[in-house]
Amino acid sequence: MRITVSHDLSRIAQSLNRLSGRLNGSLEEPLRAIGGILESSTRRRIAETKTAPDGKRWADVSPATAQAKNGRGGILVDHGNLLASITHEASAKSVITGSVMGYSVYVQEGTKTMPTRPFLGLSSQDYQDIDDLMSDWLEGLIV
């Protein structure tokens, strides 16, 4: 099972593609760093902020779930499997951040009985962090 979250980054992609041609086609170094940013922010959402990438707080767990947890963890944290499964992969042309847990799609998208609790995606802070990273990286190429 795989979850895909897409964003229109066409302006950034066009600039990166032009630059990529000058760099023999590989953007793996900055894409690996972007993956690290996204992995960290995704983990922070699960472990700390309990918010979607757009900043909206997740719904509380149901009373039945709270009782079943018996004080263990919080929203999306019971044994830590989802949190531990967040990874990223970078190549010369792309970066993927996500979870290999089969149930992650139900958490991200919700079900008839479970509210959505989006954890994958880019927040406004992620965009800013990526912009800062790319500015620094490009400046390093010029200097």
Q: What name fits each language-model region?
A:
Residues 1-143:
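Short, Lys/Arg-rich flexible segments
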